Structure formats: C-alpha cells, structure tokens
C-alpha cells in the first residue's frame, strides 16, 4: 500500500510541475488557449483526481 501511495505522490508532483510550466505558456501564446484548451482541462482533471487519490490512500495508510 505504501508503494501505491508513493507512486501517487510522485504522479501528483510530476503533474503539478508539468502544469506549472505548461499553463502559463498556453495563456501567453496568441493562439494557444483555443488550440490547447482540452489539454489544460485534462491535466487539471488529472491533478484533481490525484489529489483525491492521495487523500484516500493517506487515510488508508494512517
């Protein structure tokens, strides 16, 4: 169970880092938002899902 928790934490950190870099780049580019809107929403949905997964796994480990 701790391996799954550690992998979920790693995925959350990696997703956060990717979104931290990609979202400002998408907003700064002139045509970026209209063409990359689905990617940003997918990444945000993944991030929210990982936050809930980490919370659930944390409650099971503690």
From Swiss-Prot:
It is a multi-pass membrane protein. Gene3D superfamilies: Photosystem II PsbZ, reaction centre. One of its GO terms (biological process) is photosystem II stabilization. HAMAP family: PSII_PsbZ (MF_00644). Signal peptide: none annotated. It comes from Acorus gramineus. Pfam families: Ycf9. The gene is psbZ. Belongs to the PsbZ family. PSII is composed of 1 copy each of membrane proteins PsbA, PsbB, PsbC, PsbD, PsbE, PsbF, PsbH, PsbI, PsbJ, PsbK, PsbL, PsbM, PsbT, PsbY, PsbZ, Psb30/Ycf12, at least 3 peripheral proteins of the oxygen-evolving complex and a large number of cofactors. It forms dimeric complexes. Its main location: plastid. One of its GO terms (cellular component) is photosystem II reaction center. The chain crosses the membrane at residues 8-28, 41-61. Keywords: Chloroplast, Membrane, Photosynthesis, Photosystem II, Plastid, Reaction center, Thylakoid, Transmembrane, Transmembrane helix. It is found in: Plastid, Chloroplast thylakoid membrane. This is Photosystem II reaction center protein Z. May control the interaction of photosystem II (PSII) cores with the light-harvesting antenna, regulates electron flow through the 2 photosystem reaction centers. PSII is a light-driven water plastoquinone oxidoreductase, using light energy to abstract electrons from H(2)O, generating a proton gradient subsequently used for ATP formation.
